[in-house]
């Protein structure tokens, strides 16, 4: 078996064109253009690349984007003060604090301070809680984007045994809720999980997000499984790989996402979808 590649770049391009049309329509009707505020703390090269991509896509589809960069030793109060100003800015629909953030900054306090209706990353307790209650509001970008990929590929998820490898607040936990909403029987594995291979072997749908290059080999995967690789890891030779060994997994899976070019582009475009949703649903005036 040779897996069908789920091309995240192609799907993201379709969504991008759709967003562009919606913005053109808003302009024709003299409606306000959505605004996204991006906050970067420190000089993490990967984070700087991600921020540039997000701002670039904003420009492509006609969004307004504002960008703030702070040194790594910034006082938490300075970030909270900026967020308060952005919360009260009627031209800003979405606020994004790029992860990771330095240890002296309280993750929970920062994301709790963003107004839920401007939390386009979907990390505010209100938004994560709403997802758990089967009443999703603004949803975490990567998990929501993965569901979008499955829908575009016309994969029917109801009744599938889904295994989420990784239990982070950013991907694993919200993804498990998305999988439940999608009708899957869902298992979440983490660092304390015993016999991980057993769980993976039984997965019809496998989502992997642990940050370990080529960790999961094709031998572990069920024949005909759907494999979604969220990992993005840079090797010593400069090459980028996922958490799944793509070559061996492709021989067993029915569908698989590549790295790069899979989940990454969808995550970025989903951020803009969330920003437009926030504008239309919560901030029209």
UniProtKB/Swiss-Prot annotation:
The keyword NADP applies. InterPro entries: Aminoacid_DH-like_N_sf (IPR046346), NAD(P)-bd_dom_sf (IPR036291), THF_DH/CycHdrlase (IPR000672), THF_DH/CycHdrlase_cat_dom (IPR020630), THF_DH/CycHdrlase_CS (IPR020867), THF_DH/CycHdrlase_NAD-bd_dom (IPR020631). Pfam families: THF_DHG_CYH, THF_DHG_CYH_C. Keywords: Amino-acid biosynthesis, Histidine biosynthesis, Hydrolase, Methionine biosynthesis, Multifunctional enzyme, NADP, One-carbon metabolism, Oxidoreductase, Purine biosynthesis. Its EC number is 1.5.1.5, 3.5.4.9. NADP(+) binds at residues 166-168, 232. One of its GO terms (cellular component) is cytosol. SUPFAM superfamilies: Aminoacid dehydrogenase-like, N-terminal domain (SSF53223), NAD(P)-binding Rossmann-fold domains (SSF51735). One of its GO terms (biological process) is purine nucleotide biosynthetic process. Coiled coil: none annotated. Homodimer. PANTHER family: C-1-TETRAHYDROFOLATE SYNTHASE, CYTOPLASMIC, C-1-TETRAHYDROFOLATE SYNTHASE, CYTOPLASMIC-RELATED. NCBIfam families: PRK10792.1. Belongs to the tetrahydrofolate dehydrogenase/cyclohydrolase family. HAMAP family: THF_DHG_CYH. This is Bifunctional protein FolD. It comes from Buchnera aphidicola subsp. Schizaphis graminum (strain Sg). The lineage of its organism: Bacteria, Pseudomonadati, Pseudomonadota, Gammaproteobacteria, Enterobacterales.
